């Protein structure tokens, strides 16, 4: 008996499908792993027990800790990535990714030990992804932590061509007796501000709106570089200078100035009943923030609750240690100013005020 012929468009007549046909290129993923191994290798430090490629990354807590407490943090780069796509600049966002997490765990006194990344896209461009991961590795070197693993997710239909998203995960350790939680801060303590390298990684939805309104030439000279370079400057990593400072004197509190600016981040390390009074004249407003404020018509109060306004990290020390801390940080290459003091809060007052 003759078998019925398959219809022209039936599954039986269709050519067999592959994962590549579905939009996932396994070979590209393998090529990326090979491309990034040298970058990751440069970040190796004591404690790493294996290389990239295993199911899990192994790390041994350094023996110098008697009672180690692990401190973890995770973050992304936010809509700064949209500007990176527009400018086709992918060499700085990797450092941004590392900085956002390692600076966060640093404020509790933690030494960053290792970092993992997540790179998600619709179609994997090996060159772009390798550039991003190279920046991640460079950020890890600046922070003294190992890039010990990550995930590259190619998900067709999830992201437009040429776009991707990033997430980072940092783990550090601090001696239990040396955890910094702000509990020792008292009235009279001094608030030191460490300079930011630019906008860092927060406020970019407003930045992009201002650019949309102002329509500037992003390739034009701006304070010794192009406006595009100023806008994409990577987030500063404060780890090594501040870890060194903690070895020299008592740091009572720190605040990484991210989303919410000075007025929302400093209160996170202050006990109830304390207020940090900041003097806006104590440090210069960098030209980039002045440009954003002018072209966006942004009010002073809004600037202080959206942007870092030139201060990327706050350190609180006793008045007796303020000069020494300033000198040590300056010697380590940081720009630092005494930007305020801690005092008792007035009734109904916010925990950080800018005067």
UniProtKB/Swiss-Prot annotation:
UniProt catalytic activity: 2-formamido-N(1)-(5-O-phospho-beta-D-ribosyl)acetamidine + ATP = 5-amino-1-(5-phospho-beta-D-ribosyl)imidazole + ADP + phosphate + H(+)
Entry keywords, A to Z: ATP-binding, Cytoplasm, Ligase, Nucleotide-binding, Purine biosynthesis
Pfam families membership: AIRS (PF00586), AIRS_C (PF02769)
Enzyme class name: ligase
Subcellular location: Cytoplasm
Molecular function as annotated in GO: ATP binding; phosphoribosylamine-glycine ligase activity; phosphoribosylformylglycinamidine cyclo-ligase activity
Entry's EC annotation: 6.3.3.1
GO BP: any one term: 'de novo' IMP biosynthetic process
Pathway(s) of this molecule: Purine metabolism; IMP biosynthesis via de novo pathway; 5-amino-1-(5-phospho-D-ribosyl)imidazole from N(2)-formyl-N(1)-(5-phospho-D-ribosyl)glycinamide: step 2/2
Cross-referenced InterPro entries: PurM-like_C_dom (IPR010918), PurM-like_C_sf (IPR036676), PurM-like_N (IPR016188), PurM-like_N_sf (IPR036921), PurM_cligase (IPR004733)
Source organism superkingdom: Bacteria
Key word Cytoplasm present: yes
A cellular component annotation (GO) from this entry: cytosol
Similarity field: Belongs to the AIR synthase family.
HAMAP family, A to Z: AIRS (MF_00741)
Protein name (Swiss-Prot/TrEMBL): Phosphoribosylformylglycinamidine cyclo-ligase
Organism, scientific name: Paraburkholderia phymatum (strain DSM 17167 / CIP 108236 / LMG 21445 / STM815) (Burkholderia phymatum)
Gene: purM
């Amino acid at each position: 008996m003759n078998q019925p012929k398959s219809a022209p468009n039936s599954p039986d007549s269709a050519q067999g499908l592959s994962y590549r046909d579905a939009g996932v290129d396994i070979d590209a993923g393998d090529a990326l792993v090979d491309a990034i191994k040298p970058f990751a290798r440069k970040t190796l430090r004591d404690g790493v027990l294996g290389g990239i490629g295993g199911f899990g990354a192994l790390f041994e807590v350094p023996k110098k800790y008697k009672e180690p407490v692990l401190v973890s943090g995770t973050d992304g780069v936010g809509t700064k990535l949209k500007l990176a796509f527009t400018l086709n600049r992918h060499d700085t966002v990797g450092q941004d990714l590392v900085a956002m997490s390692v600076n966060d765990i640093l404020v509790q006194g933690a030494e960053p030990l290792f970092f993992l990344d997540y790179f998600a896209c619709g179609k994997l461009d090996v060159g772009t992804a390798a550039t991003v991961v190279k920046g991640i590795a460079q950020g890890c070197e600046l922070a003294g932590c190992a890039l010990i693993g990550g995930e590259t997710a190619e998900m067709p239909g999830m992201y437009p061509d040429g776009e991707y998203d990033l997430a980072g995960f940092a783990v550090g350790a601090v001696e239990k007796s040396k955890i910094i939680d702000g509990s020792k801060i008292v009235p009279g303590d001094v608030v030191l501000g460490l300079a930011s390298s630019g906008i860092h990684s927060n406020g970019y939805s407003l930045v992009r709106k201002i650019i949309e309104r102002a329509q500037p030439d992003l390739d034009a000279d701006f304070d010794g570089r192009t406006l595009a370079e100023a806008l994409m400057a990577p987030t500063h990593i404060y780890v090594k200078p501040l870890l060194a400072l903690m070895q020299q004197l008592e740091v009572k509190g720190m605040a990484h100035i991210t989303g919410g600016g000075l007025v929302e981040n400093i209160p996170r390390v202050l006990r109830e009943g304390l207020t940090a009074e900041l003097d806006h004249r104590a440090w210069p407003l960098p030209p980039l923030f002045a440009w954003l404020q002018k072209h966006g018509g942004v009010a002073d109060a809004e600037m202080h609750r959206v942007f870092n306004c030139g201060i990327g990290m706050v350190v609180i020390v006793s008045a007796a240690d303020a000069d020494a801390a300033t000198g040590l940080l300056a010697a380590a290459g940081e720009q630092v100013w005494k930007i305020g003091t801690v005092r008792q809060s007035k009734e109904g007052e916010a925990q950080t005020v800018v005067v």
